[in-house]
Amino acid sequence: MTIKDTFRNGVNRLAEAADVFKKDVFELEGVPAFREFYQLYIFPWLAVYKGFYKPWHWVPVVTIQQPRGAHRQLATMNAGKMACAQMARYVWNERCEIHATTTDDEDDPLDAFLQDVLRKNNFGIAFGDLAEKTFALGGGALKEWVEIPKDENGNDAAPGQIRISYHMATQFVPTAWDNSRVKCAIFLNREAKDGFYYTIVEWHHWDGSTYRVTNELYRQPIKGTDEPQNILGWWYPLDKVYPLLSPDTEIPDAHTTFFQYIRPFGANYADDNSPLGMSVYSSAMDTLHGTDIMFDSLQREFVLGKKRIIVPARAMRKVPNINGTGSMVTYFDASDEVYEALSLDDADANKIIDNSVDLRVEPHIAGINGELAILCGQIGFDPGTLSFDDTTGLKTATEVISENSKTFGTVKAHENGLRDSLIEMVHAIVELAIHYGLQWEGRSIEDIVRGGYNVAVSFDDSIIQDRAADIDEGIKLMSAAVLSKRKFMIDTLGYTPEQADAEIEQIANESKITAGTVDTVLFSTSE
């Protein structure tokens, strides 16, 4: 009996069992015991990223009307999300490029195919969003597969197209890894319909040199909005809900995984044996809490510090109108909330007291900026990258960042990890295209890459460094004969090695054209 048959028999036995209930994915056989890490770290990071973490933002309130038991929601500045969004903007923007080339020709068919795949999957925007969430939750994942349109009978209706999906850390669990490189994993795809939560558990694993993707389905009745969203529920037949989704897919002789786990730069100090990453604000949780407390206090300053005028209670009583109409009036505007009626001592019985206080806006803003400066240092930014003022609120720095800055070093460290994952993604796309026989303009991808290909990922660092200054520095180094033209073109101008070689050859050819050559061409006459 093959491993495949064993797996299918196991699925059949599951179908016969009526009591296959799983509280969460960590109760599945073969899943590492990461429940504590997700509950203590990833889920709180997600709550902070979304702007409501109950232990922080649901605070008790003591009032005369409700001396105990009342709560209110703490106002949040959401500095954690702002920090991750800024980090993602530094690392990834619309001028970043991914290329795959087989020749020096600018119209390389493989690169044209790759750009078409990226465009159809909205990669430029979607990857930026994923990068932001990855910085917040300590990890994320890309996944590639081929989508083949089916007719009503389940037959192929058109050629397949490569799809890329983008997954947060809460939708992904590694199951096998080597030196922090994840080799096998589970993806969780959850959908609510017909009164149930349906969760597809998608296993990516190896069977020798064969790459396998197997799908299981679980469902849980929807009981309310407050129930945990990570409950799997009862095992349920896949084909009853998703008849066109294959329970088992094999790719023989595969050379790469068809997903890439991406994580921020930095060690996992919470779990030494885990391949999972840490949020960029994992060591700044207390600071983020402090910024929210101060921001809430600033807002409450305007509520609690509003103008109040204390008047004698008897002055607020209604008396007959002096015009003799019999209507009742008050001496003060009863609809104006500035007045507070109190029963005063005899000495103050007729006094009207202005009880207004000065608003403490500047001390609050100074305190918030102090916390933001600490936050910047904790996540790898220069002080002032995040700041707060009374005009625009929380804002980010826009000036060019020097190469010697802390922010520059942090961004480059994150880019190195992302570059490796993006290169692996391109290899996965090419391998899927070969396996499914995909073509580009009449040529198979297998034929196009037969002689090999190169992958280049270019990050646009102009947002974090002065490009003109870098070019000037490179020219000086070349003039001093301590930097080659080829290295300058690759490192500073962003050329691929092939483009740099072609450009150097073109420059050499042009330099052979002398003034004498031009005179000969222009003024020579035939005899």
Label each residue range with its predicted role.
Residues 491-524:
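Long, highly charged low-complexity segments enriched in Glu/Asp and Lys/Arg with interspersed Ser/Thr
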Residues 424-454, 501-503:
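A glycine-biased, small/acidic residue-tolerant capping/turn segment at secondary-structure junctions
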Residues 241-403, 439-443, 458:
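Extended, charged amphipathic alpha-helical segments
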Residues 128-137, 141-278:
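Extended, regular secondary-structure scaffolds
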